[in-house]
Amino acid sequence: MLAKRIIPCLDVRDGRVVKGINFEGLRDAGSILEQARFYNNEMADELVFLDISASIESRRTTLEEVLKVSGEVFIPLTVGGGISSVERARDAFLHGADKVSVNTAAVNDPVLISRIAERFGSQAVVVAIDVKKVNGEYIVHTHSGKTPTQYEALEWAHRVQELGAGEILLTSMDRDGTQEGYDNEILKRISTSVHIPVIASGGAGNLEHLYEGFTKGHADAALAASIFHFRTYSIREAKEYLRDKGIAVRL
């Protein structure tokens, strides 16, 4: 059985780590470098760096910060926010990213997924899908959750897989920052219908939520921010809890 991954996420804005609720009401969550070092030493399996205002402001990811983080961590680093072209993906890789995460740009130009995958390999392409329930349907949103699209979540997940995505980062906007648990309904629906790994995101508030993301949502990895940034739990605590409940993790 493949080990399940625990992935902390650094949502970055104006040079600081931030965290909000339902993609709004951001509060400061510390220094980028301090958090990155902490997670590297804490046995995180990977680290995600998301410049959350890059797509809204139509600019590239803050590559200087990416370079600093990549010099401090020795775990796979995924970089997202403002990755709107093959050239910007290349720049992220040159600054130390192991994977890039595309979201808004992929919806606007789906072939971008294929172009990045052909150049750098599918394993380096994560497609972030932000979903919100609208009239009973899970609708994909872009621009940090501000813009609804015409895509239903499952339909888009299948499309990005066909285009060459190596992984899906699925975030429930309704659950984001609420600490009420992942939306395991849509998580299971997508995880069981695609053959690429799916990362659960949005809503982890305790260790049981991580467990449920794996058992009820069938996720391959669990991403969390609040519970780790504010030291409610450590990565080691999370992994030991999961191991004791029969989930394969790296310790």
From Swiss-Prot:
Keywords: Amino-acid biosynthesis, Cytoplasm, Histidine biosynthesis, Lyase
Domain of life: Bacteria
Catalytic site positions: 11, 130
Catalytic activity: 5-[(5-phospho-1-deoxy-D-ribulos-1-ylimino)methylamino]-1-(5-phospho-beta-D-ribosyl)imidazole-4-carboxamide + L-glutamine = D-erythro-1-(imidazol-4-yl)glycerol 3-phosphate + 5-amino-1-(5-phospho-beta-D-ribosyl)imidazole-4-carboxamide + L-glutamate + H(+)
A GO biological-process term: L-histidine biosynthetic process
Subcellular compartments: Cytoplasm
GO function terms (MF aspect): imidazoleglycerol-phosphate synthase activity; lyase activity
Enzyme Commission no: 4.3.2.10
GO terms under cellular component: cytoplasm
Pathway(s): Amino-acid biosynthesis; L-histidine biosynthesis; L-histidine from 5-phospho-alpha-D-ribose 1-diphosphate: step 5/9
InterPro entries, alphabetized: Aldolase_TIM, His_biosynth, HisF, IGPS_HisA/HisF, RibuloseP-bd_barrel
Function: IGPS catalyzes the conversion of PRFAR and glutamine to IGP, AICAR and glutamate. The HisF subunit catalyzes the cyclization activity that produces IGP and AICAR from PRFAR using the ammonia provided by the HisH subunit.
Quaternary structure and interacting proteins, as annotated: Heterodimer of HisH and HisF.
Family membership: Belongs to the HisA/HisF family.
Record-linked PANTHER family: IMIDAZOLE GLYCEROL PHOSPHATE SYNTHASE HISHF, IMIDAZOLE GLYCEROL PHOSPHATE SYNTHASE SUBUNIT HISF/H IGP SYNTHASE SUBUNIT HISF/H
Name the UniProt record assigns to this protein: Imidazole glycerol phosphate synthase subunit HisF
Organism, scientific name: Chlorobaculum parvum (strain DSM 263 / NCIMB 8327)
